[in-house]
Structure formats: structure tokens, C-alpha cells
A protein has these predicted regions:
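Single-stranded nucleic acid-binding surfaces, predominantly the OB-fold ssDNA-binding core
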Residues: 1-164
Length: 164
């Protein structure tokens, strides 16, 4: 399981619609595009499916092209070779503090550490750890594996940082 408590700045890319869950409660769904910066400067644009509590009267401000800052929980779902980003918003601000697209927050990861935990040294002599881990999710009768590459900016190893 990969779950992130984050703040996302982005642009509404799909108009809000109202849906009803299996318990009869209504919620709003819309899409947001944001850019994840790359070292080269180009960045990668991602589409995030957003849901939040609300009804028909709450859909008006979510027009395509509107800049938003949202706080909530981001989860990842892998179906075959596709990775989907789903976000449940607790709060949405239509006057974001920054116009820059970004995702900031904390990640909660439950999974298995890969075969290597490497200690490396940066240009200034500081030590850090690099390792990969995967999370498993059941997709029908099969299992889907999502690999994540971690960089820990400290050479300190906790007991759980043991390669498989």
C-alpha cells in the first residue's frame, strides 16, 4: 500500500461531476493536471483523479482551467501496465499561494525492500542510502507490483532497512 498525505497545486482538467457511492452518499469527481519537476527542467505532466465530499451545488467552481491547491490523501493503483493517481481532497483552495505546479507531503509505504540497500556519498562528502521497495496489490486473480525508488538523506540504517 502506498498512501501520501500531500498538498497538490495544479489545474482542473476535467469538469466536476456528481456521483453516488454504494451507501447513497454523493461526492464530486474531477481531474487535475500537475507537473512533476525533473532535473532537466522539462518535468512530467500527470493527470490525477480527484474525489471529495459534496453535491450538485458544489460543482460550479471546478471549471476546466481553474488553478487549485488541494490538501488530502493521494493513493496509487496499478492495473496491468497503467499507474493511476487517485486523490481524496479534504480541502480545496481556489486562490493558491503559489502558481507553480507541485506535489508536496509525506509518503506512507507498506511493502518489501528489494535486494540492495546501497550507501553512497554525495559531492560534499555526505553519506546517504539508496534502495528500492515494492508494494503488492491484488488485481482480480493476479497481483500487481509497484516499485518505488527511495533516497534517504542519512547513512543511518533502521532495523527495517534490510535487503530481501
Amino acid at each position: 500500500m502506498i498512501k501520501c498525505n500531500v498538498t497538490i497545486n495544479g489545474t482542473v482538467s476535467r469538469a466536476a461531476t456528481v456521483r453516488t457511492n454504494s451507501e447513497g452518499q454523493t461526492f464530486i469527481c474531477f481531474g487535475v493536471k500537475t507537473t512533476i519537476p525533473a532535473k532537466s527542467g522539462a518535468g512530467k505532466q500527470v493527470e490525477i483523479s480527484v474525489s471529495m465530499d459534496g453535491g450538485e451545488s458544489d460543482t460550479n467552481p471546478y471549471a476546466v482551467g481553474t488553478k487549485v491547491e488541494m490538501r488530502g490523501t493521494l493513493t496509487f493503483r496499478k492495473r496491468s501496465d497503467n499507474l493511476y493517481l487517485n486523490f481524496h481532497a479534504d480541502a480545496v483552495d481556489f486562490t493558491p499561494a503559489s502558481d507553480k505546479d507541485n506535489i508536496e507531503g509525506d509518503i506512507e509505504f507498506r511493502g518489501t525492500i528489494g535486494k540492495q540497500v546501497e550507501e553512497k556519498t554525495d559531492k560534499k562528502g555526505g553519506k546517504y542510502l539508496v534502495f528500492s521497495a515494492f508494494s503488492t496489490e491484488k488485481d482480480g486473480d493476479a497481483f500487481a507490483f509497484t516499485w518505488v525508488r527511495f533516497i534517504r538523506f542519512s547513512a543511518e540504517r533502521e532495523a527495517f532497512l534490510v535487503p530481501k
